[in-house]
A protein has these predicted regions:
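Catalytic cores of nucleic-acid endonucleases
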Residues: 1-37, 41
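Compositionally biased amphipathic helical and low-complexity segments enriched in hydrophobic
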Residues: 20, 29, 49, 72-73, ...
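Domain-level recognition of nuclease-like catalytic cores that cleave nucleotide substrates
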Residues: 27-65
Length: 91
């Protein structure tokens, strides 16, 4: 699963995109026409903050709209979805 956080449209400089600018409450990633996951945006952001050793990668580097983001492997997605470490903090 790739989570985009920046893009460089037409080489105009890197700007926040994707997860960093969404106003949605849920982040949906479609694996295939019959398979997808939905995760609360704040949970995904907490996951990336806590797991800050995950390196940001550049995708479509040579296109006119390259992006940067995080490649989450299946074991990462499993932790994101199942660990209470990423639950909304309670007061």
């Amino acid at each position: 699963m790739v989570v985009e956080v920046e893009q460089n449209h037409n080489n105009n400089g890197w700007k926040p995109s994707g997860l960093m600018v969404t106003e949605a409450a849920w982040w949906v990633y479609v694996y295939s026409p019959q398979a997808f996951i939905a995760v609360e945006v704040n949970r995904l952001k907490r996951y990336l903050d806590i797991n800050n050793q995950i390196k940001k990668m550049t995708f479509a580097r040579w296109s006119n709209n390259p992006s940067r983001g995080y490649l989450l492997l299946p074991e990462d997605v499993n932790k994101l979805l199942s660990s209470d470490l990423y639950d909304e903090p309670t007061e």
